[in-house]
Amino acid sequence: MSEPSPIADPYAYLNIVNNPDGSITRDLSNFPCTAATPDPSPLNPAVSKDLPVNQLKSTWLRLYLPSSAVNEGNVSSQKLPIVVYYHGGGFILCSVDMQLFHDFCSEVARDLNAIVVSPSYRLAPEHRLPAAYDDGVEALDWIKTSDDEWIKSHADFSNVFLMGTSAGGNLAYNVGLRSVDSVSDLSPLQIRGLILHHPFFGGEERSESEIRLMNDQVCPPIVTDVMWDLSLPVGVDRDHEYSNPTVGDGSEKLEKIGRLRWKVMMIGGEDDPMIDLQKDVAKLMKKKGVEVVEHYTGGHVHGAEIRDPSKRKTLFLSIKNFIFSVL
C-alpha cells in the first residue's frame, strides 16, 4: 500500500486524527524512538542520558556528551560549548527520543565537540503556543541550576547556542527573543548565538517558493497550514508573530539581539517551500543590526540533513565555523 499523499490528505500524511475535545490522536509508528546511550562505546558518537525538567508538565531532556570526553578514562577538564537543540515536528509531532533526532544530536555533540541539551516541550493542539516557548525557556533555567555531573564538569556556561530544526528552529528564534530581556537572570549562562536550521515560519500570503513548491512531497503548504491551525493560539491566523516574524517590521527585540552581539546562522534548503520566508527573516534581522550568516543549499528539501545523514558533514562544518567565529 502506498504512502498517503500530503497533497491529497494532509491529516493522513501526518498520521493524525482530530478528536471532538480539540486534541489529536497521533499514530507514531512512523517515528521510531530509541533509548539514551549512557555507556561509552566506540560505536556511539556521544553518550547520552535522560533527565527530568518539570514533572508537573512531564517535560524532560536528553543530554549528550561527546564520547571522546569520556572514552579511555579521559578526564579532560576542557569546557565545551553548550548547544540547546529543540526538535522539529510542526509543534504537533515528534519527541526528543525519536531516532532521527537522537542520531542527529549525537553527531552534533561529536562533530562540534559540544554538550548538547535537547529539551522536550508540550505539543499542540493540547498545549498551543506559546506553551512550547515557555518550556524552551524553562530548559535554560534547568541548565543554569543543574547539579548534573556532565554539566558541572564539561559545560562552558559562557558559550551557549540555541539551535533547532523546523519547529525547533522557530522555537530557538522565539526563545532567543524572550531571553534578551532576561540576560542578567540567565547568568552565568551567556547566549552567544542562534542556529536556525530550516526554521518553521509561515504567513497568510503565499511566497514565491511556496507557490513554486506547492506540490512538494515532504512539507507542502497544505500540510504546514494544518500544523499552524493546530498550534497557533485559537482565533489568530498565520500572520501572527509566532509564525511570521516579518509582520509589522518584526519584533523590536531584534535590535536588542544586535546590541547584545548575538550572531545568527540561518540554514535553509532551496527546495523547501519555506525558503523565501526564511530569507526574508534573515534580511529583517540584518536590517535590525543583527549579524547573520546565511547557509542555503540547492536541492535540499525541508529538514534534509535530519532525513539523510550523508548530507550532515558539510552542514556541521559550516556550523562549527560559525561557532568558532563567535568564541
From Swiss-Prot:
InterPro entries, per the entry: AB_hydrolase_3, AB_hydrolase_fold, Carboxylest/Gibb_receptor
Entry annotated with the keyword Plastid: no
Active-site residues annotated for this sequence: S166 (nucleophile), D272, H302
Any one GO BP annotation for this protein: regulation of secondary shoot formation
Domain of life, per lineage: Eukaryota
Record entry for activity regulation: Esterase activity measured in vitro with the synthetic substrate p-nitrophenyl acetate (pNPA) is inhibited by strigolactone.
Motif window: Involved in the stabilization of the negatively charged intermediate by the formation of the oxyanion hole: 87-89
Pfam family membership, one: Abhydrolase_3
Keywords: Hydrolase, Serine esterase
Ranges in a coiled coil: none
E.C. number(s) listed in UniProt: 3.1.1.1
Catalytic activity reported: a carboxylic ester + H2O = an alcohol + a carboxylate + H(+)
Tissue-wise expression: Expressed in roots, stems, flowers and siliques.
GO MF term list: 4-hydroxyphenylacetate decarboxylase activity; carboxylesterase activity
Record's function text: Carboxylesterase that possesses esterase activity in vitro with the synthetic substrate p-nitrophenyl acetate (pNPA). Binds strigolactones, but is not able to hydrolyze them. May be involved in the regulation of shoot branching.
Family: Belongs to the 'GDXG' lipolytic enzyme family.
Note: Gain-of-function mutant (T-DNA tagging) exhibits increased branching and decreased sensitivity to ethylene.
Name listed for the protein in its UniProt record: Carboxylesterase 20
Source species: Arabidopsis thaliana (Mouse-ear cress)
Recorded name of the encoding gene: CXE20
